[in-house]
Amino acid sequence: MKERLITDSYDGYELRYPFLVEHVKTQLEKQFWTATEARVDLDEVEMLYALTDEQRNVVKRLLPLFLRYELYVGSFWTDTYAKLFPCPEAQEAAVTVAMVERAIHARFYDKINKAFGLDKDIHYLSYLDDPAFKGRAKWIGDLLKSDD
């Protein structure tokens, strides 16, 4: 029988890449946290009272990009990685990392956005109004979708 590669599609479930299963186990059992656990009330106080107007403006302009990056990275794991590595262990790793990026990290950044009153599409999409931020977001998106 030919040795199965990580890039081979496989309908069975025999474990061949235990390091991927260990990664998933570590993520879910030792590193797992949720956006609801993370407190942002002190961030809100710091934003209001400790930052200068200029610093506040920078934070407000960067937050939508952080959220966008989390969504791009989540999509990379399900749309690119999962297609390149169709073995069961890689599929499990892909959906786990994508879940962390989308359901935890992106939700955490959104929690910050809500605390700062930046939770409307006018804010979420504001990076598109800045050519540098728009270019950066496009570059990251393209990079994560590339064949390289």
Model feature map: region roles:
Residues M1-D148:
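Non-heme di-metal
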